[in-house]
UniProtKB/Swiss-Prot annotation:
Lineage: Bacteria, Pseudomonadati, Pseudomonadota, Gammaproteobacteria, Enterobacterales
Purpose of the protein: Probably involved in ribonucleotide reductase function.
Any one GO BP annotation for this protein: protein modification process
The gene coding this protein: nrdI
Family annotation (PANTHER family): PROTEIN NRDI (PTHR37297:SF1)
Record Pfam families: Flavodoxin_NdrI
HAMAP family (UniProt xref): NrdI
Protein family according to the UniProt entry: Belongs to the NrdI family.
Annotated source species: Pectobacterium carotovorum subsp. carotovorum (strain PC1)
Full protein name: Protein NrdI
GO molecular function, one term: FMN binding
Length: 135
Protein backbone atom coordinates (compact mmCIF):
# COMPACT_ATOMS: atom_id res chain seq x y z
CA UNK A 1 0.00 0.00 0.00
CA UNK A 2 1.17 3.53 -0.73
CA UNK A 3 2.19 5.51 2.33
CA UNK A 4 0.73 8.29 4.33
CA UNK A 5 3.12 11.24 4.52
CA UNK A 6 2.62 13.40 7.59
CA UNK A 7 3.95 16.31 9.55
CA UNK A 8 3.79 16.45 13.32
CA UNK A 9 5.20 19.18 15.53
CA UNK A 10 6.93 18.56 18.84
CA UNK A 11 3.49 18.11 20.44
CA UNK A 12 3.40 14.77 18.55
CA UNK A 13 -0.42 14.87 18.17
CA UNK A 14 -0.40 13.94 14.49
CA UNK A 15 2.35 11.37 15.07
CA UNK A 16 0.27 9.64 17.75
CA UNK A 17 -2.74 9.60 15.44
CA UNK A 18 -0.70 8.09 12.59
CA UNK A 19 0.72 5.46 14.97
CA UNK A 20 -2.81 4.44 15.94
CA UNK A 21 -3.90 4.20 12.30
CA UNK A 22 -1.12 1.64 11.77
CA UNK A 23 -0.60 2.11 8.03
CA UNK A 24 2.77 2.67 6.33
CA UNK A 25 3.83 6.28 6.93
CA UNK A 26 6.72 8.66 6.29
CA UNK A 27 7.32 11.74 8.42
CA UNK A 28 8.27 15.18 7.13
CA UNK A 29 11.16 16.28 9.38
CA UNK A 30 10.45 18.93 12.02
CA UNK A 31 13.81 20.66 11.68
CA UNK A 32 14.46 22.21 8.28
CA UNK A 33 18.17 21.44 8.66
CA UNK A 34 17.38 17.69 8.71
CA UNK A 35 17.58 15.87 5.36
CA UNK A 36 14.49 16.61 3.27
CA UNK A 37 11.96 13.85 2.70
CA UNK A 38 11.76 12.79 -0.94
CA UNK A 39 8.88 10.50 -1.94
CA UNK A 40 9.05 8.05 -4.82
CA UNK A 41 5.43 6.93 -5.12
CA UNK A 42 1.89 8.27 -4.67
CA UNK A 43 0.89 9.23 -1.12
CA UNK A 44 -1.82 10.85 0.98
CA UNK A 45 -0.71 13.82 3.08
CA UNK A 46 -1.83 14.14 6.71
CA UNK A 47 -1.34 17.69 7.96
CA UNK A 48 -2.20 19.63 11.13
CA UNK A 49 -3.67 23.13 10.85
CA UNK A 50 -1.99 26.01 12.63
CA UNK A 51 -2.70 29.71 12.85
CA UNK A 52 -5.21 29.84 15.70
CA UNK A 53 -8.18 30.43 13.42
CA UNK A 54 -6.46 32.40 10.68
CA UNK A 55 -5.58 31.15 7.21
CA UNK A 56 -2.23 32.92 7.53
CA UNK A 57 0.23 30.35 8.86
CA UNK A 58 -2.33 27.52 8.75
CA UNK A 59 -0.09 25.21 6.70
CA UNK A 60 3.11 24.32 8.59
CA UNK A 61 6.25 25.77 7.00
CA UNK A 62 7.84 22.32 6.72
CA UNK A 63 4.84 21.10 4.69
CA UNK A 64 5.07 24.11 2.38
CA UNK A 65 8.76 23.37 1.77
CA UNK A 66 7.96 19.67 1.14
CA UNK A 67 5.19 20.49 -1.35
CA UNK A 68 7.21 23.21 -3.08
CA UNK A 69 9.43 20.40 -4.37
CA UNK A 70 7.76 19.54 -7.72
CA UNK A 71 8.87 15.90 -7.36
CA UNK A 72 7.03 15.52 -4.02
CA UNK A 73 3.99 17.50 -5.17
CA UNK A 74 3.61 15.30 -8.28
CA UNK A 75 2.94 12.21 -6.13
CA UNK A 76 0.30 13.84 -3.87
CA UNK A 77 -3.07 12.10 -4.33
CA UNK A 78 -5.16 13.36 -1.40
CA UNK A 79 -5.08 15.19 1.92
CA UNK A 80 -6.32 14.53 5.45
CA UNK A 81 -6.24 17.35 8.00
CA UNK A 82 -6.11 17.63 11.77
CA UNK A 83 -7.31 20.70 13.59
CA UNK A 84 -9.01 22.23 16.58
CA UNK A 85 -12.71 23.10 16.51
CA UNK A 86 -11.85 26.16 18.64
CA UNK A 87 -10.53 27.62 15.36
CA UNK A 88 -14.15 27.97 14.17
CA UNK A 89 -14.43 28.39 10.39
CA UNK A 90 -10.68 27.76 10.11
CA UNK A 91 -11.03 24.24 11.58
CA UNK A 92 -8.68 21.99 9.55
CA UNK A 93 -8.17 24.83 7.04
CA UNK A 94 -4.73 23.51 6.04
CA UNK A 95 -6.51 20.61 4.32
CA UNK A 96 -8.72 23.00 2.35
CA UNK A 97 -5.74 25.12 1.31
CA UNK A 98 -3.62 22.17 0.16
CA UNK A 99 -6.49 20.37 -1.61
CA UNK A 100 -7.35 23.53 -3.53
CA UNK A 101 -3.79 24.54 -4.43
CA UNK A 102 -2.70 21.03 -5.41
CA UNK A 103 -6.03 19.99 -7.00
CA UNK A 104 -6.39 16.78 -4.95
CA UNK A 105 -9.34 15.45 -2.95
CA UNK A 106 -9.79 16.46 0.68
CA UNK A 107 -10.44 13.02 2.14
CA UNK A 108 -11.02 13.49 5.88
CA UNK A 109 -10.63 15.81 8.86
CA UNK A 110 -10.27 15.06 12.57
CA UNK A 111 -9.83 17.00 15.78
CA UNK A 112 -6.55 17.03 17.72
CA UNK A 113 -5.58 13.40 18.47
CA UNK A 114 -8.65 11.95 16.74
CA UNK A 115 -11.11 9.49 18.24
CA UNK A 116 -11.15 5.72 17.87
CA UNK A 117 -13.83 6.29 15.22
CA UNK A 118 -11.54 8.69 13.33
CA UNK A 119 -8.73 6.13 13.40
CA UNK A 120 -11.04 3.43 12.01
CA UNK A 121 -12.48 5.79 9.38
CA UNK A 122 -9.04 6.85 8.16
CA UNK A 123 -7.73 3.27 8.08
CA UNK A 124 -10.78 2.10 6.11
CA UNK A 125 -10.97 5.19 3.89
CA UNK A 126 -7.29 5.14 2.94
CA UNK A 127 -7.42 1.42 2.14
CA UNK A 128 -10.51 1.91 -0.04
CA UNK A 129 -9.00 4.99 -1.70
CA UNK A 130 -5.91 3.06 -2.83
CA UNK A 131 -8.01 0.09 -3.97
CA UNK A 132 -10.09 2.45 -6.15
CA UNK A 133 -6.91 3.96 -7.61
CA UNK A 134 -5.75 0.57 -8.87
CA UNK A 135 -9.04 -0.58 -10.44
Amino acid sequence: MNPLVYFSSQSENTHRFISRVGLPALRIPIATEQPALKVDRPYILVVPSYGGGSTKGAVPRQVIIFLNDPHNRAYLRGVIAAGNTNFGAAYCIAGDIIAQKCQVPYLYRFELLGTAEDVANVRKGVTEFWQQQTT
